[in-house]
């Protein structure tokens, strides 16, 4: 089984090679492989999570078909778009305490300027 970090890097490399414009947009996002385990069927499913800043939301979703095509070609089930801005600015979010590294990564994504 390949690691999630390796799959993320492979996805990023493929996007940059096949769709350079989408690669530029995704360089302003945080891309991560998310795992879903369904206990009943004892199966793991992997999703592509794209955390984006609100100022490029429409640019990211513009390349949805290209992103989904490559994600499916490497065995991922679905592509999920998540607003990093909303997560970082949510006053009741426990992410900063529970996973400070992810919170810092998302904060970095939100503060970038295009």
Identify what each model region corresponds to.
Residues 1-43:
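N-proximal, solvent-exposed amphipathic alpha-helical segments enriched in charged/polar residues
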Residues 31, 48, 79-82:
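Hydrophobic beta-strand residues in large extracellular and virion-surface proteins
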Residues 41-68:
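A short interface-forming secondary-structure element
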Residues 104-114:
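Extended, charge-rich low-complexity interaction segments
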Residues 68-101:
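A short amphipathic beta-strand at an alpha->beta junction
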Residues 38, 57, 86-88:
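Generic "edge-of-domain/loop-turn" microfeature
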Residues 16, 20, 72, 111-112:
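Generic surface-pattern signal
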């Amino acid at each position: 089984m390949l690691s999630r970090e390796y799959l993320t890097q492979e996805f990023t490399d493929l996007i940059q090679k096949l769709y350079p414009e989408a690669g530029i947009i995704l360089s302003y996002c945080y891309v991560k492989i998310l795992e879903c385990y369904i206990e009943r069927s004892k199966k793991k499913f992997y999703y592509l999570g794209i955390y984006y800043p609100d100022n490029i939301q429409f640019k990211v979703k513009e390349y949805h078909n290209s992103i989904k095509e490559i994600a499916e070609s490497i065995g991922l089930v679905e592509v999920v778009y998540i607003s990093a801005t909303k997560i970082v600015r949510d006053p009741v979010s426990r992410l900063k305490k529970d996973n400070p590294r992810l919170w810092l990564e998302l904060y970095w994504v939100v503060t970038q300027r295009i």
